[in-house]
Amino acid sequence: MSSRRSVGDPEYLTRRIPQNPRYQHIKTRLDTGSSLTKYIEKLEEIKRNYRYRKDELFKRLKVTTFAQLVVQVASLSDETLEVTNEEIHKLEGGNSPASDADAELTAGTNGKGSPNGTPPSPVLFINNAGAGESYRSTLQSLISGVGELDIEKDTHKKADTQAKDTPYPDCPFLLLDVRDRDAYDQCHIVGAYSYPIAMLSRAMNPYTNSILEYKNAHGKIIILYDDDERLASQAATTMCERGFENLFMLSGGLKVLAQKVPEGLITGSLPISCQVAAPTGSARKKPVPKVPPTRAESKWRYSAEDLQKIKYYLEEEQLPSDTASRLSRGSSGRDSKATTARSSPSLPSTAGSRMLSRSSIQNRPWK
């Protein structure tokens, strides 16, 4: 009997699918759960971006946690600044009745300070709202109130701009850049102080006044960062050995910061080693014009646009990526839609949910 022959090539199932280098950077959207391949990729990412050691004396601070801390501090400082401005305007408005009373007193003069009739009795000054003021001081307040009103407004505006150019008052963290001064002038995080690692080798006065103020202070921390944890880990270890207990290192440095929050936190142009590489397998390679690197600004506070960018990237990082969380999010979304459809005919938009998530980020206390 002749042996039965199988249909098709037996090596068809073991044949590997040829890979196109053009689409190697595109990842699958189907998440099959935990696997050895994903675990190896995660380990490679950790080795590429982080430098963990078993005997680390310092504590680490994630980039996302630092961004949340920045948003909370900036929003709280802006609220207190608005409250103080409102109080100043209220105090300025409270002086208007006194100026009206002064105008009534000057109505009895001929414009040169000489009274038309009998001089006012001392009883008027006692019963007046400005008790204890003499006739001369009342006229002086009137003169200063007419001509110097615009000057006072300009001084308030200058004070507001000067307050925005200074660091945040009572900031819970002190951010130190341990790179060289040239690298700091090229690019740094907003609100960071330049503190090169060579300062630790000084025999006399190795620390600045701000570092001594924040050292082991209650409710305050010191954060060190660099490009890729090489210098920051050495500086953090040395400072912890010298008695700093509230010291943290920004995990990943500017390299991970450029990946997680590429806009809003940094002023100046990032170094080439920290820039995110473009995907290699592109359909058409377009020539990218080279932009000259810009110098970092002397910037101590975040603008409203910077805070919006930081919140946007924080929302992108907090979105769940695994299948189970997506399924749970979808089921909870369907349940919430059903309940809202019963209660109200209109469904909430995604913008409302984003605003809720942003407010929840701001309401979280920093740790």
Swiss-Prot record:
Q: What InterPro entries does its record include?
A: CEP41, Rhodanese-like_dom, Rhodanese-like_dom_sf
Question: What keywords were assigned to this record?
Answer: Cell projection, Ciliopathy, Cilium, Cilium biogenesis/degradation, Cytoplasm, Cytoskeleton, Protein transport, Transport
Q: Which GO terms describe its cellular component?
A: centriole; centrosome; ciliary basal body; cilium; cytoplasm
Domain named Rhodanese is located at: 169-266
Query: Where located?
Result: Cytoplasm, Cytoskeleton, Microtubule organizing center, Centrosome; Cell projection, Cilium; Cytoplasm, Cytoskeleton, Cilium basal body
* UniProt biased composition (Polar residues): 107-116, 338-367
Q: Superkingdom of the source?
A: Eukaryota
- The principal location of this protein is cytoplasm
Q: Which GO terms describe its biological process?
A: cilium assembly; protein polyglutamylation; protein transport
Q: What CDD domains does the record tag this protein with?
A: RHOD
Q: Where is this region: Disordered?
A: 89-121, 319-367
Describe its function. Required during ciliogenesis for tubulin glutamylation in cilium. Probably acts by participating in the transport of tubulin polyglutamylases between the basal body and the cilium.
Q: Which PANTHER family match?
A: CENTROSOMAL PROTEIN OF 41 KDA
Please report which protein family the annotation says this sequence is part of: Belongs to the CEP41 family.
Protein name, please?
Centrosomal protein of 41 kDa
Native organism: Gallus gallus (Chicken)
Gene for this protein?
CEP41
